Amino acid sequence: MVLSQRQREELNKAIADYLASNGFMEALESFKKETDMPGDIDKKYAGLLEKKWTSVIRLQKKVMDLEGRLAEAEKEYISGTPSREKRSPTEWIPRPPERSALLGHRAPITRVLFHPVYSVVVSASEDASIKVWDYETGDFERTIKGHTDSVQDIAFDHTGQFLASCSADMTIKLWDFKSYECLRTMHGHDHNVSSVCFLPSGDHVVSCSRDKSIKMWEVATGYCVRTFTGHRDWVRMVRVNSDGSLLASCSNDQTVRVWVVGTKECKLELREHDHVVECVAWAPAHAQLCGAAGDSNRRPGAGGAQGTGPFLVSGSRDKTIKVWDVSTGLALFTLVGHDNWVRGVKFHPGGKYLLSASDDKTLRVWELAHQRCCKTLDAHSHFCTSLDFHRTAPYVVTGSVDQTVKVWECR
């Protein structure tokens, strides 16, 4: 492309201003002489070269983003993937590129979580803060501060009125999510508190810790009312089932345990992982798991009997995801495909898919009925540590050691 005479003159004056403002006086005099530039440079050319340069970079970034979206759209068009309008919401899965990348944390993201009512996503980080973002606009809303060390996990009660957080500072905090006020701080663990969740009733919080214990706390008073012991090493995560009768926990001792909330009894110890078990998730009642496992996947002596659930999923540093039938204590099947530690697992609200996040930097979508990975997204530039799937809106969120939170649209 050839510049017009006027464009050439404007470019020369912008270059001259750049040379003058950076003190390259000899080069400026030589340049003015070579280009026959008269007198002083008009002030309107001040900083023009830098502005043009940065605008070109911004445009290049936008073009690359659009090219990526176009390539993905062409790929899906060729493969015959239907648009969202033609698909049932139970079929929607996250697709690249991300809708937004949320920047603000100064250390790795440990947990991401959608609010059950508001259009916000909450992130916890090793920078000891919790941040609130509008996932539709990508806008940062506020920072919640109070912990003095890495925030390890966060959880909402079913109304979204209360937020619980736990930290390496050995405390659990309860926050009013309207006023962002810390209502109470719960002390009792002797080491890093790694996970927290609400019982469905909202009147109790459950936590687990590197001190090998699981504790239940009364929300109204902040008192510890129950302690579950049995794990032989750091308890990484604890999650409660939909009716609040069972707890699932996983540990550095390479086991998953299922506990009866009312009696503190350890109902099951599941032992098939070969490394630290990082995460667990309960399957929704409508998850497509009952017919997913054939007899070949069962242990000898199972007699081919089909369990009725409930079902539980665990992700491990052995790079695998296991699906368990809690009624029989058997692993139904193992999902293999990640190239590094599995850090997060989450069921699709429709029950057809399972999503997983891994230190291989990917977000994977697994079709449960066929036990296969049907989509892999290169989600982050570093380890992918956490994910969540919105219960009603078509969004997935991921967090990473790269300090970003990414929102993905589903279709």
Curated annotation (Swiss-Prot):
GO terms for biological process: brain morphogenesis; cell division; establishment of mitotic spindle orientation; germ cell development; microtubule organizing center organization; microtubule sliding; nuclear migration; retrograde axonal transport. GO terms for cellular component: axon cytoplasm; centrosome; cytoplasmic microtubule; kinetochore; microtubule associated complex; neuron projection; neuronal cell body; nuclear envelope. Keywords: Cell cycle, Cell division, Coiled coil, Cytoplasm, Cytoskeleton, Microtubule, Mitosis, Repeat, Transport, WD repeat. WD repeats lie at residues 104-145, 146-187, 188-227, 230-269, 272-334, 337-376, 379-411. Gene3D superfamilies: 1.20.960.30, YVTN repeat-like/Quinoprotein amine dehydrogenase (2.130.10.10). Residues 77-96 are annotated as: Disordered. Its main location: cytoplasm. It is found in: Cytoplasm, Cytoskeleton; Cytoplasm, Cytoskeleton, Microtubule organizing center, Centrosome. Residues 7-39 form the LisH domain. Residues 54-80 form a coiled coil. SMART domains: LisH, WD40. Residues 77-89 have a biased composition (Basic and acidic residues). It comes from the Eukaryota. The keyword Cell cycle applies. GO terms for molecular function: dynein complex binding; microtubule plus-end binding. Positively regulates the activity of the minus-end directed microtubule motor protein dynein. May enhance dynein-mediated microtubule sliding by targeting dynein to the microtubule plus end. Required for several dynein- and microtubule-dependent processes. Belongs to the WD repeat LIS1/nudF family. Dimerization mediated by the LisH domain may be required to activate dynein. This is Lissencephaly-1 homolog.
